[in-house]
Amino acid sequence: VNLAKEIDADLVMASDPDADRVGIACKDDKGEWVLINGNQTCMMYLYYILTQYKQLGKIKGNEFCVKTIVTTELIKKIADKNNIEMLDCYTGFKWIAREIRLSEGKKKYIGGGEESYGFLAEDFVRDKDAVSACCLIAEVAAWAKDNGKSLYQLLLDIYVEYGFSKEFTVNVVKPGKSGAEEIKAMMENFRANPPKELGGSKVILSKDYKTLKQTDDKGNVTAIDMPEPSNVLQYFTEDGSKVSVRPSGTEPKIKFYMEVQGEMG
């Protein structure tokens, strides 16, 4: 970012050492550099791809996108408004790759991603790929600039058209054997006593991916169509908020993914 300031760049892109994730930064409307999170990047990818597909007449009705269940629901809104199917899968790009494989010869995959900075456009790679992602975000930035906008202004346009979304994650660390037992007890308590309200808004749908059952606010129970059980709980509220809870698979912590939505004028 310091170098970007020196040369008055429009965009900063950085990948991790194995080049599967990419983070970006751009200037806001005051000229200050801001970091763009994984959800926001995925929004801009999808918005751009669908805009180009529509302009080129490439939407044939069999296209689909994929997101993980903890990724923002605003991405689904973008897909829905453009009549593109959006599939949900578990955290981890192997699940996105699975959906691509299952749809080979039937549907066309045109993009997908997860909130943890992993993205994939087209299907010639079957894992998150920072190289193609960097190429695509540079193309998005150039397209925005050709239309007299910055990436930041493009993001604001998306919020105005589809609604505002704010996401954040809280990690609660519980080390050792006692910590693992405490995390297990927390998940069991959430299952036994699911919240009725979150942030003052009524919970209208609870999903338990361990039992593969979902319950609405009227008590109706239906099945969740996923390939296997997973220790994840999700709560959706009347005002469009979403809270996802799951233990980490690699570290002694429990993770809370939170999303709130609203309107921008």
Protein language model features and the residues they cover:
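Short gly/pro/ser/thr-enriched loop/turn and capping motifs at secondary-structure boundaries
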Residues: 21, 42-44, 93-97
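Catalytic or ion-translocation cores adjacent to nucleophile or general acid/base/metal-coordination motifs
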Residues: 36-51
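Short Gly/Thr/Asp-enriched flexible loops that form oxyanion-binding sites at enzyme active sites
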Residues: 20-38
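N-terminal small/polar loop signature for handling phosphorylated ligands or for N-terminal nucleophile
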Residues: 1-21
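A generic beta-sheet turn/junction motif
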Residues: 17, 249-251
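Phosphate-binding and adjacent anionic-ligand microenvironments
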Residues: 5, 9-11, 32-34, 52-246, ...
